[in-house]
């Protein structure tokens, strides 16, 4: 069925995305929205403008079962295309610039960072909460906050005011391709269902 607006692993039926720009697809692949593609499979296509087609080989080849990936196209009519979700994240807050010892330590113990952001005098490293037990013996003088999930919005970022009662949101970054938010919520599946329905991504 191509790439869905929400990863099918959540069991929430959503629409097939007809078109994704290269950078939108990379964002979705990196942050839990599309397990059928990998960022490294898209990056070589960008310089030459080669398109990619994602479709189910067991279904008829129709617009409803196919996602095309190509050059980024941003228009006034651009809208939210997809939601990515990585459950169970931790955010390490440290003084900027980031201490090289921290980055070296993460590399040595083979931990993947999902995002690094700098705001003012501080830097924020986002990674899986499952790695924290390995990290704590190697770091000190840092603040660590835990969140239910990292949510990525691909396309136009929606207003989250109507979802304030369902979760405590923390913005990490935003760009023309979307944004990254950490959220604490008592019911992640319910929040994803509500986001999908209210933002018109559900089937």
Predicted regions and their residues:
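C-terminal catalytic "cap/lid" subdomain
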Residues: 1-203
């Amino acid at each position: 069925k191509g790439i869905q607006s929400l990863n099918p692993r959540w069991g929430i039926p959503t629409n097939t995305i007809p078109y994704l720009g290269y950078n939108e697809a990379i964002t979705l692949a990196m942050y839990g929205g599309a397990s059928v593609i990998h960022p490294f499979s898209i990056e070589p296509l960008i310089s030459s403008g080669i398109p990619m087609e994602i479709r189910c080989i067991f279904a008829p080849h129709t617009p409803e079962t196919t996602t095309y990936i190509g050059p980024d196209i941003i228009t006034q009519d651009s809208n939210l295309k997809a939601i990515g979700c990585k459950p169970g994240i931790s955010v390490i807050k440290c003084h900027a610039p980031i201490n090289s010892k921290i980055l070296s330590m993460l590399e040595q113990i083979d931990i993947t960072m999902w995002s690094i952001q700098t705001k003012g005098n501080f830097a924020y490293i986002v990674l899986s909460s499952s790695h924290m037990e390995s990290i704590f013996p190697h770091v000190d003088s840092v603040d660590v906050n835990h969140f239910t999930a990292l949510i990525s919005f691909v396309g136009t970022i929606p207003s989250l005011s109507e979802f304030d009662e369902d979760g405590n949101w923390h913005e990490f970054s935003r760009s023309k391709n979307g944004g990254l938010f950490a959220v604490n919520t008592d019911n992640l599946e319910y929040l994803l269902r509500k986001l999908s329905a209210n933002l018109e991504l559900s089937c």
